[in-house]
Each structure stands twice: as C-alpha cells, then as structure tokens.
Amino acid sequence: MTIAIGTYQEKRTWFDDADDWLRQDRFVFVGWSGLLLFPCAYFALGGWLTGTTFVTSWYTHGLATSYLEGCNFLTAAVSTPANSMAHSLLFVWGPEAQGDFTRWCQLGGLWAFVALHGAFGLIGFMLRQFEIARSVNLRPYNAIAFSAPIAVFVSVFLIYPLGQSGWFFAPSFGVAAIFRFILFFQGFHNWTLNPFHMMGVAGVLGAALLCAIHGATVENTLFEDGDGANTFRAFNPTQAEETYSMVTANRFWSQIFGVAFSNKRWLHFFMLLVPVTGLWMSAIGVVGLALNLRAYDFVSQEIRAAEDPEFETFYTKNILLNEGIRAWMAAQDQPHERLVFPEEVLPRGNAL
C-alpha cells in the first residue's frame, strides 16, 4: 500500500489566475467589483459629459440643454426621453433609433444610457466596499450605509418613472433640471407634507448635526501630549493609545444635556443609523409616489377655507400653490397633450 504524504492541491484554473490579477495589491484596487464599477462609471460620466456638451433637448422637451446651445453648468442637462417613448430602454440598435446615433440622442437615448449605467455603477461601488472589507477583515457597514444613496437613486430615477407613464417623468440629469423636478414633486404629489419626506429631512439634517457635534467634541477633547507642531502632527497613525478623551466628552455632554453617550460603539452606530434610515425612508416614500399614493390631506380645512373667505391656513395656501404649479407645469411640460383647464380648476384665492 502506498501512502501519499503532503497536501492535495487542486489544479489551478483561469478563474484562479483572474482572481489573483484582479485582487492583487496595486495603487487603485480593481477586484471583481471593478469589472462592474469601472466600465459603468466611465460610461455614465462620459454619457453625461457628452450630453451636456453637445446634445439638445429640443425634440423631447423643447429646451436648450447643452453648452453648445448656450447653457452653463447649472442649466445644462441630459434630458429624459420623449413622453411617446414610454418605458423603452432605447437601445441604439432598437426600433426607435434603428442604429442612427444622432436620432438616438434626439429621442433621449442618452438619458436611459446614463441612468442605467449610473445605477449599476453605484451598485458596483457598494460591491467594491464589500470586497475590500472582506479582504482586510473589516465588517461591511460602509457598504450597508452606501445602500441608502443607491436606494434613493433607484427609487427616484428608475422606480418613480416606471410607476408613471414613461421615463419622461423622471428627473433629467442637471442642476436646474433637478430643481424643476422637485417643484414638480411638490405640485403634483404635495411631497413636503409626505411623512416619508419628513423622515428623510430629519435623517439628513439630523446626521449633519450629529456630524458637527461629533467632530467638535473630538477636537475639544484631544490629548495634547504630543511633540508635533499642531493637532494633526501630534500623534502617530499607528499609535496604541486613544487620541481623545471619551470620559471628558461624556462629562461635557452630561452637563449640557443631562444625558450623553458613554459607549463609542453605540455612538457611532447611531451616527450611521440616522442618515441611512432617513434616506431609506425617503426612497420608500418615492416608491409610494410612483404608485400615486397621497400625502396627508386635511380635507376639513380645505372645505372650511372654500366656504369661509376669512379662514385660511398655511396648509390651504400651499394647496392653492400646488394647484398653480400643476396648471402651469402640465401645459408647459406636455404641450403634446393639448391640455385645456376650465376656469373652475384653475388656482383661486390669494395664495398666488
């Protein structure tokens, strides 16, 4: 009988070679996630730069949206496809453009290109954080936190227009274009009175407050026993001891508020929880808007305001303002619908 001594090694395959090359130590880590991230990010950014530089929105929105037409950084945009395109993916080789690149740009194909590559690019970036965290034995909280902006992007740019009649009703990729979309959301959905929007605002602004308080508190309680010229040179990045005094910080905030965090883990988890929860709530709210779910309606106030000219609240004024936004934007944004509003549905009262 023959006894083989040693460890059995499986035969290496092309997958092992690819894994070695993709995950080797280099200045910019590639990894398996990079196969998704880098091409998608390149195409999304390249498509946006191309669109804002050269491509008009005359055929989709009746607007000038490129630097070539006289726009600047704040007014240029890659606009959504025409309303008649519905939810078509608008491939260059598809039945709409039929391989004609110019026609594809005129129909709004660049928007679909940027939106889809952008979504997969963001997902690739989250996978990159998972992959690197696994490689260096970190927990995956960075990737989990980044799921929040991904949820917002996907809900606003993809799910909302999927619930409506077409990509036309998604935001265009531009600064002023996003502002107009926000006004649209307010006028047609009363978004500011939606509880999910309120939770989102509380999460984002609460996170900003927590960030400012945390940074100031750490700066306030830094140990000074270093020989460096300033705060940033006083400590070695590989030091074993603490940089700041948690005990002093706890004492300070206990005196200010009467309560304070005494545990660093809970403190930092709370700083993660607040913005991530807020953004996720916003994303859920936008999914609701895709289904045309309504915000709060205080009908009793509306009825009383309609019957009593001396009764008005900030709510009833905002409702009138929303009616004005709808009456103005619908005819402007959708001239092809030939919308005609009878007098009784046009804004009334003194809100405008």
Swiss-Prot record:
Subcellular location(s) of the protein: Plastid, Chloroplast thylakoid membrane
High-level lineage: Eukaryota, Viridiplantae, Chlorophyta, core chlorophytes, Chlorophyceae
Modified residues (Phosphothreonine): 2
Record's protein name: Photosystem II D2 protein
Assembly and oligomerization: PSII is composed of 1 copy each of membrane proteins PsbA, PsbB, PsbC, PsbD, PsbE, PsbF, PsbH, PsbI, PsbJ, PsbK, PsbL, PsbM, PsbT, PsbX, PsbY, PsbZ, Psb30/Ycf12, at least 3 peripheral proteins of the oxygen-evolving complex and a large number of cofactors. It forms dimeric complexes.
Binding site for a plastoquinone: 214, 261
Protein family according to the UniProt entry: Belongs to the reaction center PufL/M/PsbA/D family.
Any one GO MF annotation of this record: chlorophyll binding
Keyword Disulfide bond: no
Membrane topology qualifier: Multi-pass membrane protein
Cross-referenced InterPro entries: D1/D2 (IPR055266), Photo_II_D1/D2_sf (IPR036854), Photo_RC_L/M (IPR000484), Photo_RC_L/M_CS (IPR055265), PSII_PsbD/D2 (IPR005868)
